[in-house]
Amino acid sequence: MTSPSTIKQKFIAKGHQLGVVAVGFSDGQPNQGVDPSGLIEAGLLDQLRDDLEYDIRHDGKVHTYAEFVPEHDPNHRGMKKPRTVSAATQQLSRQVYEHAREGRLVLTLGGDHSIAIGTISGTAKAIRERLGREMAVIWVDAHADINRPEDSDSGNIHGMPLAFLTGLAKDDNEDMFGWLQPDNLISPRKLVYIGLRDVDRAEKRLLKEHGIKAFSMHDIDKYGIGRVVEMALAHIGQDTPIHLSFDVDALDPQWAPSTGTPVRGGLTLREGDFIAESIHETGSLVAMDLVEVNPTLETLGASETIRAGCSLVRSALGDTLL
């Protein structure tokens, strides 16, 4: 039987409280159906409450932010639906900020990975205000998602969140991410990738130019997942709050087929769980995103993908094998 974690959380004032935001937003990419309802219906929040004994603070809604969508949203700098994504992520940023400011651990269930513009900006601001320090981001994904608008071939904003969050991409228009302020941003030095295997040429150049720490599947094959996680955490340092943003497509499609941009040669489910377990064991986790679960794609694999997503979240929040 699962029991609550005994790991003391260093940066969470209300360690028993879990702020949950469910986000059914998919306009950062072309596929509809990126929605956390399957995770919730599979009992994820019940498991976190009953087995891990979290006091769940959730409004019971899956937010689509449809009320914030403008009537007209033409492309801007090559970005598709920029005003829609900006408005949705600004609202999400406020929601995450409210939870994090209260000292709660925050779990956001997506939603495509563009929502990280909202989640990370909200957490970063709250951590600066509450603790007076910068946080780190561990981004577990097959993709780097750090394209600047002008570098993106697709124009889909789910491939750009880290460009905006690090300040490598900016826009002065309030309706198109101009609302992002310095206290919403993270330093490229505090960003670590794990699991990369489909990185655009312009993104590779940015990673090198800015000295961003990135561990690809080549590194995992070479060193093993244990050593890679050790190196990632050593880069961040022991006294740094961590926001974990986990794209389910980091897993090999064998384990998570129901996602919009699957790439073969990825993490096993155990490797994904190990990353999440190890971050929990640091006692430094302040927020987690799980994104890009889309049960409408590869419907025969939907239940497998949902089970994998639930496992990743439980592992990050203190579930153990023994």
Curated annotation (Swiss-Prot):
<dbReference type="GO" id="GO:0030145">
    <property type="term" value="F:manganese ion binding"/>
</dbReference>
<feature type="binding site">
    <location>
        <position position="261"/>
    </location>
    <ligand>
        <name>substrate</name>
    </ligand>
</feature>
<dbReference type="GO" id="GO:0019547">
    <property type="term" value="P:arginine catabolic process to ornithine"/>
</dbReference>
<feature type="binding site">
    <location>
        <position position="292"/>
    </location>
    <ligand>
        <name>substrate</name>
    </ligand>
</feature>
<dbReference type="InterPro" id="IPR014033">
    <property type="entry name" value="Arginase"/>
</dbReference>
<feature type="binding site">
    <location>
        <begin position="154"/>
        <end position="156"/>
    </location>
    <ligand>
        <name>substrate</name>
    </ligand>
</feature>
<feature type="binding site">
    <location>
        <position position="145"/>
    </location>
    <ligand>
        <name>Mn(2+) 1</name>
    </ligand>
</feature>
<dbReference type="GO" id="GO:0004053">
    <property type="term" value="F:arginase activity"/>
</dbReference>
<feature type="binding site">
    <location>
        <position position="141"/>
    </location>
    <ligand>
        <name>Mn(2+) 1</name>
    </ligand>
</feature>
<dbReference type="Pfam" id="PF00491">
    <property type="entry name" value="Arginase"/>
</dbReference>
<dbReference type="InterPro" id="IPR023696">
    <property type="entry name" value="Ureohydrolase_dom_sf"/>
</dbReference>
<dbReference type="InterPro" id="IPR006035">
    <property type="entry name" value="Ureohydrolase"/>
</dbReference>
<comment type="subunit">
    <text>Homotrimer.</text>
</comment>
<feature type="binding site">
    <location>
        <position position="200"/>
    </location>
    <ligand>
        <name>substrate</name>
    </ligand>
</feature>
<protein>
    <recommendedName>
        <fullName>Arginase</fullName>
        <ecNumber>3.5.3.1</ecNumber>
    </recommendedName>
</protein>
<feature type="binding site">
    <location>
        <position position="247"/>
    </location>
    <ligand>
        <name>Mn(2+) 2</name>
    </ligand>
</feature>
<feature type="binding site">
    <location>
        <position position="141"/>
    </location>
    <ligand>
        <name>Mn(2+) 2</name>
    </ligand>
</feature>
<feature type="binding site">
    <location>
        <position position="247"/>
    </location>
    <ligand>
        <name>Mn(2+) 1</name>
    </ligand>
</feature>
<dbReference type="GO" id="GO:0005634">
    <property type="term" value="C:nucleus"/>
</dbReference>
<keyword id="KW-0464">Manganese</keyword>
<feature type="binding site">
    <location>
        <position position="113"/>
    </location>
    <ligand>
        <name>Mn(2+) 1</name>
    </ligand>
</feature>
<comment type="pathway">
    <text>Nitrogen metabolism; urea cycle; L-ornithine and urea from L-arginine: step 1/1.</text>
</comment>
<keyword id="KW-0056">Arginine metabolism</keyword>
<dbReference type="GO" id="GO:0000050">
    <property type="term" value="P:urea cycle"/>
</dbReference>
<keyword id="KW-0479">Metal-binding</keyword>
<feature type="binding site">
    <location>
        <position position="143"/>
    </location>
    <ligand>
        <name>Mn(2+) 2</name>
    </ligand>
</feature>
<feature type="binding site">
    <location>
        <position position="249"/>
    </location>
    <ligand>
        <name>Mn(2+) 2</name>
    </ligand>
</feature>
<dbReference type="InterPro" id="IPR020855">
    <property type="entry name" value="Ureohydrolase_Mn_BS"/>
</dbReference>
<comment type="similarity">
    <text>Belongs to the arginase family.</text>
</comment>
<feature type="binding site">
    <location>
        <begin position="143"/>
        <end position="147"/>
    </location>
    <ligand>
        <name>substrate</name>
    </ligand>
</feature>
<dbReference type="GO" id="GO:0005829">
    <property type="term" value="C:cytosol"/>
</dbReference>
<keyword id="KW-0378">Hydrolase</keyword>
